[in-house]
């Protein structure tokens, strides 16, 4: 089993990144691919290896605590790797832990693939068991909102636009419109990225 990879990111896509280690390129699924940038600088990516009847998949994480949170979610009945990854894509891990501790089912059921029964199971299995994880809040907390914050998704979309070759100045010109769009639509990273591309192509 892998603990982490240390290598260069050679490709970034909406669903995964490719990291090259000792001349071998690994396809790694990650919640927020645009957190990474293609370049010669070596990055450390924590890895969870999942084996199923469909083959082997690698899931990547920014640090050990994010990986630990993912693996805790996997221990909940009804949560598979892709569902756990979708939950982490919100980018507000402290808000997630707070929601679990407060039994905030409305917050939890807003994630893809999480129904009321699964939300209750998450609370039952994980309440009070995640407080030792060192995670940061990148958006609003569960106290402030009944649905996941869009701040993390917006940041990822803006980073993605720059990764696609748009200048910081061009991206800055559409940031305000994307902020408004995200607040009214509650959009995820891919939706915000598509809207950003549409706005930039109009210029």
Curated annotation (Swiss-Prot):
The lineage of its organism: Bacteria, Bacillati, Bacillota, Bacilli, Lactobacillales. Keywords: Cytoplasm, DNA damage, DNA recombination, DNA repair, DNA-binding. Has three domains with a flexible linker between the domains II and III and assumes an 'L' shape. Domain III is highly mobile and contacts RuvB. Residues 149-203 are annotated as: Domain III. The keyword DNA-binding applies. GO terms for biological process: DNA recombination; DNA repair. The RuvA-RuvB-RuvC complex processes Holliday junction (HJ) DNA during genetic recombination and DNA repair, while the RuvA-RuvB complex plays an important role in the rescue of blocked DNA replication forks via replication fork reversal (RFR). RuvA specifically binds to HJ cruciform DNA, conferring on it an open structure. The RuvB hexamer acts as an ATP-dependent pump, pulling dsDNA into and through the RuvAB complex. HJ branch migration allows RuvC to scan DNA until it finds its consensus sequence, where it cleaves and resolves the cruciform DNA. Residues 1-62 are annotated as: Domain I. This is Holliday junction branch migration complex subunit RuvA. Residues 63-141 are annotated as: Domain II.
């Amino acid at each position: 089993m892998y603990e982490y990879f240390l290598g260069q990111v050679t490709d970034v896509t909406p669903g995964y990144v490719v990291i090259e280690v000792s001349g071998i390129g690994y396809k790694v699924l990650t919640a927020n691919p645009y957190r990474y940038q293609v370049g010669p600088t070596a990055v450390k990516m924590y890895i969870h290896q999942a084996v199923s009847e469909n083959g082997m998949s690698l899931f990547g994480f920014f640090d050990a605590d994010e990986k630990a949170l993912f693996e805790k979610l996997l221990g909940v009945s009804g949560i598979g790797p892709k569902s756990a990854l979708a939950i982490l894509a919100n980018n507000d891990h402290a808000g997630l832990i707070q929601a679990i501790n407060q039994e905030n089912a409305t917050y939890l059921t807003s994630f893809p693939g999480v129904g009321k029964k699964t939300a209750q199971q998450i609370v039952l299995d994980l309440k009070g068991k995640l407080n030792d994880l060192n995670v940061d809040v990148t958006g609003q907390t569960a106290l402030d909102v009944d649905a996941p914050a869009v701040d993390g998704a917006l940041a990822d979309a803006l980073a993605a636009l720059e990764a696609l070759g748009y200048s910081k100045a061009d991206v800055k010109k559409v940031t305000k419109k994307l902020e408004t769009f995200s607040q009214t639509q509650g959009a995820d990273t891919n939706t915000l990225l598509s809207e950003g591309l549409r706005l930039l192509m109009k210029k």
